[in-house]
């Protein structure tokens, strides 16, 4: 087990230790507070600590043999068992220990190693599940607890992905609207639909087929000049058929185009990846408008490949180990179609889990800890944006009720609110961590801090993983 620590800048007035987790399952925790620094007041008063989750590089990496299925039918009907067996073969006895509860108990071991009586906790995304679990198991050792972008405990784990799908599509529409609002800079169109048309053409150029994602709603500005007298009828017809047209056109093209596969489009996969983070939206616009030269994607190093492999293996094993949401076998045809026929990057992940394919042939090893605020001395703080696609607001309220948390509702739809330069929210987070309370209940969405007209100068951007060498 590896622990990282950044000492409090004002040791004379240090209040304690703040342990953070960035999410996942499978997120690398060790560098969290380096790339997502808390507000200055928190850096002054707390040692910033991260405990690498078990299963990852730095946390005894899970090793797995190569995935090998006799045929596609066996892979679909026994996917979870094959996956578990291949990891068991390479790491005997270890896969069964990969659970959120054990990760929480590892944090408790870290507390002993640090020699402190209480920990303050900051969890983002899946980190909210982990930190709420720790607080439930060890309330006597829990001080402040911040739950940033909270996972719905009732969806663990088969339902989580499908709950995200509508939000991801909605955030892409919001991205198109944002680009259209900056048409003076990007010249991609003055309406979301106009931007989408250029985006769709780029996807088709890269993949050989158009995307199956429906276009944003048409507006008056999208009506052809000759049809202005029938604007409302035109708009209604376009919007009513948008989803069906996109799916049909993608399917026909996929069937007729050798090698046509929308998931081969770097623009499409990057758009889906960055939808929950407005700081990356300018990068999509810059690439789409050809305002910046395309750079060759950076080839990952062997260490990066090892870390990514361990992360993916750990995530799947952990989720199947503690899966509680019933599988929906009726969704198997839709899951196979989305994953194997049209490669729908928006719908495929959720359907893969909801249908039960991801854990097929296995049963859960444990029941997740039922989280609660029993015994906590300080009321937890929960933060969520209203349109967060990755941890939808409605689901986050389930964890809020379970933990009796004070809620700060953030505007917009960014996922993860730490280190976004949101001054009102940062002040509230600092106030809570230092005093144990805050009266703030709402905050605006964070500003976009990425340059709008050029690529960031920082090297090693995570955007390099999205298919373009940004």
Language model features by range: what are they?
Residues 199-374, 469:
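Alpha/beta-hydrolase fold active-site neighborhood
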Residues 69, 135-198:
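A catalytic-pocket lid/entrance helix-loop region that shapes and gates access to the active site
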Residues 93, 101-118:
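Conserved acidic catalytic loop of the alpha/beta-hydrolase fold
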Residues 389-394:
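Conserved alpha/beta-hydrolase "acid-adjacent" motif
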Residues 413-426:
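Catalytic histidine-centered segment of alpha/beta-hydrolase-like enzymes
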Residues 1-77, 386, 398:
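N-terminal cap/lid subdomain of alpha/beta-hydrolase-fold enzymes
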Residues 375-376, 381-384:
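Short beta-strand/loop motif that positions the catalytic acidic residue
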């Amino acid at each position: 087990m590896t622990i990282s620590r950044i000492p409090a800048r004002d040791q004379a007035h240090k209040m304690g230790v703040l342990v953070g987790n960035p999410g996942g399952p499978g997120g690398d925790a060790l560098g969290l507070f380096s790339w997502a620094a808390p507000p200055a007041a928190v850096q002054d008063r707390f040692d910033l600590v991260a405990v690498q989750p078990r299963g990852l590089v730095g946390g005894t990496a899970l090793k797995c043999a190569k995935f090998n299925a006799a045929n596609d039918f066996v892979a679909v009907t026994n996917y979870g068992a094959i996956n578990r067996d291949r990891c068991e073969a390479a790491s005997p006895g270890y896969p069964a220990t990969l659970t959120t509860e054990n990760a929480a108990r590892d944090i408790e071991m870290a507390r002993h190693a640090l020699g402190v009586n209480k920990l303050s906790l900051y969890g983002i995304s899946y980190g909210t599940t982990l930190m709420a679990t720790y607080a439930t198991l060890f309330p006597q050792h829990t001080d402040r607890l911040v739950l940033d972008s909270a996972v719905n405990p009732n969806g663990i784990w088969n339902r989580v992905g499908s709950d995200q799908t509508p939000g991801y599509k909605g955030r892409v529409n919001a991205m198109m609207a944002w680009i259209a609002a900056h048409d003076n800079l990007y010249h991609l169109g003055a309406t979301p639909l106009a931007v989408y048309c250029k985006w769709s053409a780029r996807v088709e150029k890269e993949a050989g087929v158009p995307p199956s994602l429906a276009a944003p709603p048409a507006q008056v500005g999208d009506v052809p000049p000759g049809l202005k007298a029938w604007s409302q009828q035109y708009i209604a017809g376009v919007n009513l058929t948008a989803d069906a047209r996109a799916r049909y056109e993608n399917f026909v093209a996929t069937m007729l185009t050798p090698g046509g596969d929308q998931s081969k489009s770097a623009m499409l996969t990057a758009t889906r990846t960055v939808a929950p983070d407005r700081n990356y939206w300018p990068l999509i616009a810059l690439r789409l408008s050809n305002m910046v030269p395309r750079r060759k994607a950076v080839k990952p190093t062997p260490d990066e490949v090892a870390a990514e492999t361990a992360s993916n293996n750990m995530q799947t094993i952990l989720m199947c180990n503690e899966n509680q949401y019933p599988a929906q076998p009726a969704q198997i045809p839709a899951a196979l179609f989305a994953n194997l026929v049209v490669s729908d990057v928006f719908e495929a992940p959720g359907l893969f889990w909801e249908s039960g394919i991801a854990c097929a042939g296995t049963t859960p090893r444990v029941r997740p800890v039922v989280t609660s605020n029993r015994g906590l001395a300080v009321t937890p703080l929960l933060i969520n944006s209203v349109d967060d696609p990755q941890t939808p607001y409605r689901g986050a309220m389930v964890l809020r009720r379970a933990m009796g948390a004070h809620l700060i509702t953030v505007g917009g739809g960014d996922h993860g609110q730490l280190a976004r330069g949101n001054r009102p929210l940062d002040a509230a987070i600092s106030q809570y961590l230092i005093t144990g309370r805050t009266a703030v209940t709402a905050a605006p969405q964070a500003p976009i801090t990425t340059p709008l007209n050029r690529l960031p100068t920082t090297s090693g951007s995570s955007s390099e993983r999205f298919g373009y060498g940004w």
